Design a protein with these regions (language model features):
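Radical SAM/AdoMet-radical enzyme domain recognition
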Residues: 1-113
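Flexible loop/turn segments at secondary-structure boundaries
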Residues: 17-19, 44-45, 86-88, 118-120, ...
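A generic alpha-helix structural signal
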Residues: 67, 95, 134-135, 193
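A C-terminal junction/extension of Radical SAM enzymes
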Residues: 76, 107-109, 113-184, 220
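Short clusters of hydrophobic/aromatic residues that line enzyme substrate/ligand-binding pockets
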Residues: 46, 159, 189-192
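A structure-centric signal for secondary-structure junctions around beta-strands
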Residues: 6, 163, 209-212
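Flexible mid-to-C-terminal extensions adjoining Fe-S/redox cofactors in radical SAM and related proteins
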Residues: 180-253
């Protein structure tokens, strides 16, 4: 900022510690444009999963209030809702609640995301139907984050993992290629104190797989999540399921 270099900031947060004072004082300094906040379900489910020591910070109502505060200062919020086979009914209830609060708030969007790599994963063949039923609950299905990106130019990389000069850094200063690698010592590239040890892995970019080259969703996905693929989980980005679900909702009207 002092050097006159243009920049902006985005954040992934649980929103528990965000206050109006913080938003007013620091967000302009950081040029904060976007925050992603995860809600794991309706009040009882959310508070059960989070289980904060400070029950007040972890209150569902506190998070909802903080999201409202953020949006009031014209910072966009994507509410990420993780979905597996066990919580689909609760997710429907959550979206009904969110629509009552944020249905007309243009600064708040939704990011329904399937959990991958667990025994409770929603089967790939069921995901479009699951999202279709969620989109039907919304006044404006275009509030779903991926739909907002439908008309943007095609991707040339799925995420920052494919960029040789992009990194994820954990709280101890360890450097990784991807946020999904954090906490896995075998995937560490180095640290911010001594530098990157594995220069070849830093530069290495996974090649687009043959099945992805032929996929109609490739321009919106470009191979998807390499971390999920390496774990034998579904690598496809949410767009792969949201786009056909959204098109079905449009055709119903």
């Amino acid at each position: 900022r002092e050097a006159g270099v243009p920049y902006y900031t985005s954040m992934i947060s649980n929103a528990s510690l965000i206050t109006e004072e913080l938003v007013k004082e620091y967000f302009p300094v950081w040029n904060m444009k976007h925050i992603q906040v995860t809600l794991d379900g309706t009040k009882d489910e959310y508070e059960r999963i989070k289980a904060y020591d400070d029950k007040n910070l972890g209150r569902f109502e506190n998070i909802i209030n903080n999201i409202t505060v953020i949006s009031k200062y014209k910072v966009s919020v994507d509410i990420r809702v993780n979905i597996d086979q066990k919580n689909i009914e609760d997710v429907h209830k959550l979206f009904n609640q969110l629509e009552k609060i944020y249905g007309d708030n243009s600064m708040v969007r939704y990011y329904p995301a399937f959990i991958n790599g667990s025994s409770c994963d929603v089967p790939v063949e069921s995901r479009v139907d699951v999202l279709y039923n969620i989109l039907k609950l919304m006044k404006d299905p275009a509030k779903v984050m991926s739909v907002n990106r439908l008309y943007k130019q095609p991707l040339t990389a799925p995420c920052h993992r494919a960029q040789p000069n992009a990194f994820s850094i954990d709280a101890e200063g360890n450097v990784y290629k991807c946020e999904h690698d954090i906490g896995r010592p075998d995937n560490k590239l180095g640290d911010i104190f001594t530098g990157v040890d594995d220069e070849e892995r830093r530069k290495n970019v996974a090649q687009l797989r043959e099945e992805c080259e032929k996929c109609v969703f490739s321009p919106k996905c470009y191979g998807g999540c390499e971390s999920n693929f390496l774990k034998s989980a579904d690598p496809c980005m949410a767009d792969r399921y949201i786009i056909p679900a959204y098109m079905s909702v449009i055709l119903d009207k």
